[in-house]
């Protein structure tokens, strides 16, 4: 039996319709769903998520459990709508070793949530939730959005990157860096898996692309890009608007 056939069987189960009615009832704040084991919980979740009525946040017991659950959902739904929200630390928080890749994943989740995309599903675990995040307002102030065809001064973009504490380098190879070569700005946002290449023609953005770090070759054309700095940098010292991740979520989010 294929994954598609399994999902179709779950979709036709009478309890799915009952669950959807419960999720749509705003007067109900808590309910219990039991009797699931192994990957059956992922299958059930994938059917509910596919309705795209609410954002979902699944809180697993630890990193390993969250990783397995995330992998199952990606196999069922694809990568576009399923996001992973890890701890920003490589090991336990007490060791203080930040992981740039994890920080990218965390920032991407916040950026996607702020856009209020329908059908988002986020998988996380307690260690990740223990770390506070910036507020919606703080994130908005620390976000630069650029679109192909925008009329914007190249120096303005450079000034914003400096203000965001991006590091000027010859070649971009890790998040938080930018480089300038002629009419091109390369920048590695903390909200993207790949760095961006912004090509100007005078005061107009002629093209936006992602590129590979190792080869420095262009990868994919984009209509728009979102540039976000390291949101944790300096906030603890400045007393920035740090809040719980759960407070960042919209009121219609389903926690499971």
Where are these regions (language model features)?
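ASCE RecA-like P-loop NTPase motor cores
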Residues: 1-256
